[in-house]
A protein has these predicted regions:
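Core catalytic lobe of class I
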Residues: 1-232, 237-239, 268
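Conserved SAM-binding loop
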Residues: 242-243
Length: 268
C-alpha cells in the first residue's frame, strides 16, 4: 500500500501546537498520555505528569471531525480520570491483554497484572471497521445432538444460518504481545495494536493525531497503513528519535510511492 505524503511532526507542548491545527481536520485522536501513576520520587519518572484533560478535550473537539474517534490508552485510576473527563461522549472500553505479566514484587498481595485499558469516545457514530479473525465455524442455531432442530428461538431458515463463516467479530479483549525487545520508550506500545486501532476507526487516507507521540510508534503504524499522521512531542530526545525512526521507515517505503516527512519546532 502506497504511503501518503503527509506526515507532520511537531516539537513542543501539545497545548502550544494543537491550537495551530485546522478545525475538523482529524478523524482519529490516538492518545497515549502520561498516566501520572509512577513514583514521584523517581527522577527517571519526571516525565509522567498528568495532562490537563479538560484543556485537551477543548482542542481535540475543535480539531476532530464531527464523527472523530478519540481513543486513549489508560490503566488503573487514570482510566477513571479519562472516562470522567468526558462522560457524555464515553462509549466503551477495550482491554489490551499484553501476554506479559508485571507486579511480581506484590504477587503475594494482589494478582499479577497483564493488561491495560483502551477507552473509546465519540460524539457522533465514528467510523468502525471490525477487524475479523479466523475461528471455528459458528454453532448453527437450532441444532442439537440428535440432528433434529429445535424451536427454542422460533422458526429459522437453515439455508441462511448455514452461510455463517469462520470469520469472527472482534471482542472487547485485544491480545497483542508486548514488545519483548528493549523498549525505545518506557511506555512504548506495539505497532501491531496501533495498526489494529487505526484500521478499526479510520479509512485509507484519513488523518490520525497523537498529541504525545513519544518514540513515534503511532506514526509508523500510519505510514504502514496509508494514513496521514500528526505527531507532537515536547521531549527533544524523543522527538529527534521519532523523526529519525519515521524517516527510516519512509525510506523503506519509497519504492512504493513518495512520502513527505515534515518537522517543525515550537521553540518551547
Amino acid at each position: 500500500m502506497q504511503p501518503r505524503n503527509d506526515t507532520s511532526l511537531f516539537k513542543g507542548n501539545c497545548f502550544d501546537i494543537l491550537p495551530t491545527l485546522p478545525s475538523s481536520s482529524v478523524q482519529l485522536f490516538l492518545c497515549d498520555l502520561p498516566y501520572g501513576v509512577l513514583n514521584k520520587q523517581n527522577p527517571h519518572a519526571a516525565w509522567d505528569k498528568p495532562v490537563n484533560l479538560n484543556a485537551l478535550w477543548k482542542e481535540m473537539k475543535r480539531i476532530g471531525t464531527p464523527n472523530c474517534a478519540y481513543v486513549f490508552f489508560a490503566s488503573g485510576l487514570f482510566t477513571h480520570d479519562v472516562i470522567e473527563s468526558n462522560r457524555k461522549d464515553f462509549k466503551y472500553t477495550l482491554v489490551w491483554d499484553k501476554k506479559a505479566t508485571t507486579g511480581f514484587l506484590n504477587a503475594k498481595k494482589q494478582p499479577l497484572r497483564r493488561h491495560e485499558d483502551i477507552v473509546v469516545f465519540y460524539a457522533k457514530q465514528c467510523k468502525y471497521h471490525p477487524q475479523f479473525t479466523k475461528g471455528t465455524p459458528s454453532h448453527i442455531r437450532g441444532a442439537n445432538a440428535t440432528g433434529k432442530g429445535n424451536h427454542n428461538y422460533g422458526n429459522y431458515n437453515p439455508e441462511i444460518t448455514m452461510k455463517y463463516t469462520d470469520d469472527k467479530y472482534p471482542t472487547s479483549i485485544l491480545c497483542f504481545e508486548k514488545n519483548k525487545h528493549v523498549l525505545k520508550h518506557p511506555t512504548e506500545k506495539p505497532v501491531s495494536i496501533l495498526e489494529w486501532l487505526v484500521n478499526t476507526y479510520t479509512d485509507d487516507g484519513d488523518t490520525v493525531c497523537d498529541p504525545t507521540m513519544g518514540s513515534g510508534s503511532c506514526g509508523e503504524a500510519c505510514l504502514n497503513l496509508n494514513r496521514k499522521f500528526v505527531g507532537i512531542e515536547m521531549d527533544e530526545i524523543w522527538y529527534d528519535y521519532a523523526v529519525n525512526r519515521l524517516e527510516y521507515r519512509t525510506e523503506e517505503t519509497k519504492s512504493n510511492g513518495s512520502t513527505k516527512l515534515s518537522g517543525e519546532e515550537n521553540g518551547n
